[in-house]
Protein backbone atom coordinates (compact mmCIF):
# COMPACT_ATOMS: atom_id res chain seq x y z
CA UNK A 1 0.00 0.00 0.00
CA UNK A 2 2.81 2.41 0.88
CA UNK A 3 4.56 1.62 -2.41
CA UNK A 4 1.37 2.46 -4.31
CA UNK A 5 1.09 5.76 -2.44
CA UNK A 6 4.73 6.52 -3.19
CA UNK A 7 4.24 5.93 -6.92
CA UNK A 8 1.09 8.05 -7.00
CA UNK A 9 2.85 10.93 -5.27
CA UNK A 10 5.68 10.85 -7.79
CA UNK A 11 3.53 10.34 -10.86
CA UNK A 12 1.41 13.41 -10.16
CA UNK A 13 4.46 15.55 -10.77
CA UNK A 14 6.46 13.39 -13.13
CA UNK A 15 7.55 16.40 -15.12
CA UNK A 16 9.72 17.63 -12.29
CA UNK A 17 11.61 14.35 -12.05
CA UNK A 18 13.79 15.43 -14.91
CA UNK A 19 14.24 18.98 -13.67
CA UNK A 20 17.71 20.42 -13.48
CA UNK A 21 19.47 19.92 -10.19
CA UNK A 22 19.58 23.68 -9.70
CA UNK A 23 19.40 26.91 -11.65
CA UNK A 24 22.60 28.60 -12.75
CA UNK A 25 21.62 31.72 -10.87
CA UNK A 26 22.12 30.43 -7.34
CA UNK A 27 22.92 33.68 -5.52
CA UNK A 28 19.43 33.60 -4.04
CA UNK A 29 20.44 30.57 -1.97
CA UNK A 30 22.77 32.61 0.20
CA UNK A 31 20.03 35.19 0.70
CA UNK A 32 17.63 32.46 1.83
CA UNK A 33 20.25 30.79 3.98
CA UNK A 34 21.09 34.03 5.77
CA UNK A 35 17.41 34.87 6.18
CA UNK A 36 16.73 31.51 7.82
CA UNK A 37 19.79 31.73 10.07
CA UNK A 38 18.80 35.22 11.21
CA UNK A 39 15.07 34.69 11.79
CA UNK A 40 14.56 31.06 12.76
CA UNK A 41 15.70 30.72 16.38
CA UNK A 42 14.25 27.66 18.08
CA UNK A 43 15.90 24.49 19.42
CA UNK A 44 13.29 22.22 17.84
CA UNK A 45 12.34 23.82 14.52
CA UNK A 46 14.93 26.50 13.95
CA UNK A 47 17.66 26.95 11.37
CA UNK A 48 19.56 23.73 12.15
CA UNK A 49 16.36 21.71 11.66
CA UNK A 50 15.93 23.26 8.22
CA UNK A 51 19.50 22.37 7.29
CA UNK A 52 18.94 18.77 8.42
CA UNK A 53 15.69 18.50 6.48
CA UNK A 54 17.37 19.68 3.28
CA UNK A 55 20.27 17.26 3.58
CA UNK A 56 18.12 14.29 4.58
CA UNK A 57 15.59 14.91 1.80
CA UNK A 58 18.42 14.90 -0.75
CA UNK A 59 19.89 11.72 0.74
CA UNK A 60 16.55 9.91 0.66
CA UNK A 61 15.84 10.90 -2.94
CA UNK A 62 19.32 9.83 -4.01
CA UNK A 63 18.84 6.45 -2.33
CA UNK A 64 15.56 6.03 -4.22
CA UNK A 65 17.18 7.18 -7.52
CA UNK A 66 14.72 10.05 -7.76
CA UNK A 67 15.84 13.35 -9.27
CA UNK A 68 14.58 16.42 -7.46
CA UNK A 69 14.45 20.05 -8.48
CA UNK A 70 17.05 21.29 -6.03
CA UNK A 71 15.90 24.90 -6.28
CA UNK A 72 12.46 23.90 -5.04
CA UNK A 73 13.80 21.59 -2.35
CA UNK A 74 16.32 24.10 -1.02
CA UNK A 75 13.82 26.94 -0.77
CA UNK A 76 11.11 24.75 0.75
CA UNK A 77 13.43 23.07 3.25
CA UNK A 78 14.99 26.29 4.50
CA UNK A 79 11.68 28.19 4.68
CA UNK A 80 9.11 25.51 5.55
CA UNK A 81 8.74 26.60 9.19
CA UNK A 82 8.92 30.36 8.63
CA UNK A 83 5.35 30.90 9.84
CA UNK A 84 6.23 29.33 13.18
CA UNK A 85 8.08 32.60 13.87
CA UNK A 86 7.07 36.24 14.26
CA UNK A 87 5.93 38.21 12.40
CA UNK A 88 4.46 35.45 10.24
CA UNK A 89 3.05 33.27 13.04
CA UNK A 90 -0.77 33.17 12.99
CA UNK A 91 -1.33 30.02 15.05
CA UNK A 92 -3.31 32.01 17.66
CA UNK A 93 -5.73 32.90 14.88
CA UNK A 94 -6.13 29.22 14.05
CA UNK A 95 -3.95 29.35 10.93
CA UNK A 96 -1.53 26.45 10.69
CA UNK A 97 2.08 27.44 10.16
CA UNK A 98 2.37 25.17 7.11
CA UNK A 99 -0.54 26.89 5.37
CA UNK A 100 0.62 30.38 6.30
CA UNK A 101 4.20 29.60 5.33
CA UNK A 102 3.04 28.41 1.92
CA UNK A 103 1.05 31.61 1.50
CA UNK A 104 3.81 34.07 2.39
CA UNK A 105 6.98 32.32 1.20
CA UNK A 106 7.01 34.42 -1.96
CA UNK A 107 7.70 37.51 0.16
CA UNK A 108 11.13 36.06 0.89
CA UNK A 109 11.87 34.61 -2.54
CA UNK A 110 10.77 37.43 -4.82
CA UNK A 111 13.59 39.76 -5.74
CA UNK A 112 16.31 37.28 -4.79
CA UNK A 113 16.74 35.76 -8.23
CA UNK A 114 14.76 32.64 -7.36
CA UNK A 115 12.99 31.30 -10.48
CA UNK A 116 9.46 32.69 -10.14
CA UNK A 117 7.97 29.79 -12.10
CA UNK A 118 8.97 27.47 -9.26
CA UNK A 119 7.33 29.35 -6.38
CA UNK A 120 4.11 27.33 -6.57
CA UNK A 121 6.10 24.11 -6.22
CA UNK A 122 7.76 25.56 -3.11
CA UNK A 123 4.33 26.47 -1.72
CA UNK A 124 3.15 22.92 -2.36
CA UNK A 125 6.09 21.36 -0.52
CA UNK A 126 5.76 23.68 2.46
CA UNK A 127 2.01 23.15 2.73
CA UNK A 128 2.37 19.37 3.12
CA UNK A 129 5.64 19.09 5.02
CA UNK A 130 4.09 17.89 8.30
CA UNK A 131 3.87 14.14 8.79
CA UNK A 132 0.08 14.09 9.12
CA UNK A 133 -0.36 15.61 5.66
CA UNK A 134 -0.11 13.91 2.28
CA UNK A 135 2.54 15.30 -0.08
CA UNK A 136 2.12 15.53 -3.85
CA UNK A 137 5.21 15.57 -6.04
CA UNK A 138 8.78 14.46 -5.40
CA UNK A 139 10.12 17.56 -3.64
CA UNK A 140 7.09 17.63 -1.34
CA UNK A 141 7.43 13.91 -0.64
CA UNK A 142 11.07 13.96 0.38
CA UNK A 143 10.74 17.13 2.45
CA UNK A 144 7.74 15.56 4.18
CA UNK A 145 9.66 12.38 4.98
CA UNK A 146 12.78 14.21 6.13
CA UNK A 147 10.69 16.38 8.42
CA UNK A 148 8.92 13.31 9.83
CA UNK A 149 12.14 11.37 10.45
CA UNK A 150 13.57 14.35 12.33
CA UNK A 151 10.99 13.62 15.07
CA UNK A 152 12.41 10.14 15.66
CA UNK A 153 15.68 8.75 17.01
CA UNK A 154 18.16 10.68 19.12
CA UNK A 155 17.55 13.95 17.31
CA UNK A 156 13.81 13.59 17.90
CA UNK A 157 14.47 13.21 21.62
CA UNK A 158 16.81 16.20 21.63
CA UNK A 159 14.29 18.41 19.83
CA UNK A 160 11.42 17.65 22.19
CA UNK A 161 13.44 17.81 25.40
CA UNK A 162 14.88 21.16 24.32
CA UNK A 163 11.35 22.56 24.49
CA UNK A 164 10.92 21.83 28.21
CA UNK A 165 10.40 25.07 30.14
CA UNK A 166 13.15 25.39 32.78
CA UNK A 167 10.90 27.62 34.89
CA UNK A 168 8.10 25.12 35.40
CA UNK A 169 5.89 26.19 32.52
CA UNK A 170 4.78 24.02 29.63
CA UNK A 171 5.83 21.78 28.19
CA UNK A 172 7.15 20.25 31.40
CA UNK A 173 8.85 16.85 31.65
CA UNK A 174 5.66 14.75 31.56
CA UNK A 175 4.27 16.76 28.63
CA UNK A 176 7.53 16.24 26.75
CA UNK A 177 7.30 12.49 27.36
CA UNK A 178 3.75 12.53 25.97
CA UNK A 179 5.02 14.32 22.87
CA UNK A 180 7.72 11.68 22.40
CA UNK A 181 5.21 8.86 22.87
CA UNK A 182 2.88 10.46 20.34
CA UNK A 183 5.72 10.79 17.84
CA UNK A 184 6.64 7.15 18.33
CA UNK A 185 3.05 6.07 17.75
CA UNK A 186 2.13 8.38 14.89
CA UNK A 187 5.17 9.26 12.81
CA UNK A 188 6.49 5.88 11.52
CA UNK A 189 3.42 5.03 9.44
CA UNK A 190 3.50 8.45 7.80
CA UNK A 191 6.95 8.02 6.27
CA UNK A 192 6.12 7.19 2.65
CA UNK A 193 9.25 6.89 0.51
CA UNK A 194 11.13 3.58 0.22
CA UNK A 195 14.37 5.10 1.51
CA UNK A 196 12.55 6.79 4.35
CA UNK A 197 10.81 3.58 5.34
CA UNK A 198 14.17 1.83 5.55
CA UNK A 199 15.34 4.34 8.14
CA UNK A 200 12.28 4.05 10.34
CA UNK A 201 13.03 0.84 12.31
CA UNK A 202 16.35 2.02 13.76
CA UNK A 203 15.05 5.47 14.63
CA UNK A 204 11.91 3.94 16.08
CA UNK A 205 14.04 1.61 18.19
CA UNK A 206 16.23 4.46 19.45
CA UNK A 207 13.24 6.52 20.56
CA UNK A 208 11.51 3.54 22.16
CA UNK A 209 14.69 2.59 24.03
CA UNK A 210 15.06 6.12 25.39
CA UNK A 211 11.50 6.14 26.65
CA UNK A 212 11.90 2.73 28.26
CA UNK A 213 15.11 3.77 30.01
CA UNK A 214 13.52 7.00 31.19
CA UNK A 215 10.46 5.16 32.47
CA UNK A 216 12.61 2.72 34.42
CA UNK A 217 14.85 5.40 35.91
CA UNK A 218 11.99 7.69 36.99
CA UNK A 219 9.60 5.15 38.52
CA UNK A 220 7.25 5.20 35.57
CA UNK A 221 7.87 8.92 34.92
CA UNK A 222 6.61 9.79 38.40
CA UNK A 223 9.94 11.36 39.35
CA UNK A 224 10.22 13.62 36.33
Regions found by a protein language model. Name each.
Residues 53, 96-110:
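An active-site-proximal "capping" alpha-helix that borders the catalytic cofactor pocket
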Residues 112-116:
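Inter-helical turn/loop segments and adjacent helix faces that build the functional surface
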Residues 4-16:
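Bacterial N-terminal signal peptides
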Residues 31-41:
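Generic N-terminal amphipathic, Lys/Arg-enriched alpha-helix
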Residues 25-33, 50:
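Onset of an N-terminal alpha helix
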Residues 18-22:
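Boundary at the C-terminal end of the N-terminal hydrophobic targeting segment
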Amino acid sequence: MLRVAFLIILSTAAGSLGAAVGSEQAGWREVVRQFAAQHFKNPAWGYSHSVRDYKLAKDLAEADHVTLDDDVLFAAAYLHDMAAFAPWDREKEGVDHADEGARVVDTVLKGTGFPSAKIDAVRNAIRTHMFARTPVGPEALYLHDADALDWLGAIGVARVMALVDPNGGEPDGPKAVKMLEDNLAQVPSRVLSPAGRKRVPLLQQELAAFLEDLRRETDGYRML
